[in-house]
């Protein structure tokens, strides 16, 4: 029975590949690091998961660390995320506006919901998407439960969050809030070129060499 359970466990799909350990050689010897730490050394923050309190804290900590290391050198945020919590979005968003360095945002794969706002919130002229990226915006949502007074409170909060989302997107796309309000009524999906036309990004890129991304860092 134990062997059968072990066999079934081994047959289950794995959530991720095993990350390789990168060996760095310096004058002081060799030391290992994971790819995310290596990227951080290059001032790259990689957001490749759902946006929740844990991932938001990770991103915020990295932004603050990189600012302390060099407040005048750009930071890059690479995004491949389905979105997530609105409060976690605002935490990262406010930190992006708070720190001194310019922040370049790059969509690789998808930037949906909260992640699309972070993509648009990069420094003007330094917001990019790879050519087959998918970007999605929509209104905030929440599940209401409890007494009628509780549901009423939650409904007011949803309206407040929606108003804030509309204002954020209007600021970073140059569109009017009423136009944003109509567009997020339902899921609105963009190709990379459509996202550029809408004002969510500044450039669609195929390679680093052929884009402003080469000089944005």
UniProtKB/Swiss-Prot annotation:
It is an enzyme of class 3 (hydrolase). It catalyses: Hydrolysis of proteins to small peptides in the presence of ATP and magnesium. alpha-casein is the usual test substrate. In the absence of ATP, only oligopeptides shorter than five residues are hydrolyzed (such as succinyl-Leu-Tyr-|-NHMec, and Leu-Tyr-Leu-|-Tyr-Trp, in which cleavage of the -Tyr-|-Leu- and -Tyr-|-Trp bonds also occurs). Disulfide bonds: none annotated. Its EC number is 3.4.21.92. GO terms for biological process: protein quality control for misfolded or incompletely synthesized proteins. InterPro entries: ClpP (IPR001907), ClpP/crotonase-like_dom_sf (IPR029045), ClpP/TepA (IPR023562), ClpP_His_AS (IPR033135), ClpP_Ser_AS (IPR018215). Signal peptide: none annotated. CDD domains: S14_ClpP_2. GO terms for molecular function: ATP-dependent peptidase activity; ATPase binding; serine-type endopeptidase activity. The active site is at 113 (nucleophile), 138. It is found in: Cytoplasm. GO terms for cellular component: cytoplasm; endopeptidase Clp complex. It holds the Pfam family CLP_protease. Keywords: Cytoplasm, Hydrolase, Protease, Serine protease. Belongs to the peptidase S14 family. Cleaves peptides in various proteins in a process that requires ATP hydrolysis. Has a chymotrypsin-like activity. Plays a major role in the degradation of misfolded proteins. Fourteen ClpP subunits assemble into 2 heptameric rings which stack back to back to give a disk-like structure with a central cavity, resembling the structure of eukaryotic proteasomes. This is ATP-dependent Clp protease proteolytic subunit 2. The gene is clpP2.
């Amino acid at each position: 029975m134990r062997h059968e359970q072990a066999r079934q466990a081994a047959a289950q799909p794995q959530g991720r590949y095993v990350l390789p350990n990168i060996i760095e050689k310096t004058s002081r010897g060799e030391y290992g690091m994971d790819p995310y730490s290596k990227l951080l050394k290059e001032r790259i923050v990689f957001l490749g998961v759902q946006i929740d309190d844990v991932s938001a804290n990770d991103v915020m900590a990295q932004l603050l660390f990189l600012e302390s290391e060099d407040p005048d050198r750009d930071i890059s945020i690479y995004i491949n995320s389905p979105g997530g919590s609105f409060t976690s979005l605002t935490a990262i968003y406010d930190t992006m506006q708070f720190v001194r360095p310019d922040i370049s945002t790059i969509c690789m794969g998808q930037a949906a919901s909260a992640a699309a706002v972070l993509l648009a919130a990069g420094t003007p002229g330094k917001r990019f998407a790879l050519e087959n990226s998918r970007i999605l915006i929509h209104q905030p949502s929440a599940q209401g439960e409890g007494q009628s007074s509780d549901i009423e409170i939650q409904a007011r909060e949803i309206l407040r969050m929606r108003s804030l989302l509309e204002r954020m997107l209007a600021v970073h796309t140059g569109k009017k809030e009423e136009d944003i309000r109509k567009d997020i009524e339902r899921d609105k999906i963009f190709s990379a070129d459509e996202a550029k036309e809408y004002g969510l990004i500044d450039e669609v890129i195929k390679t680093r060499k052929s884009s402003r991304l080469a000089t944005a860092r």
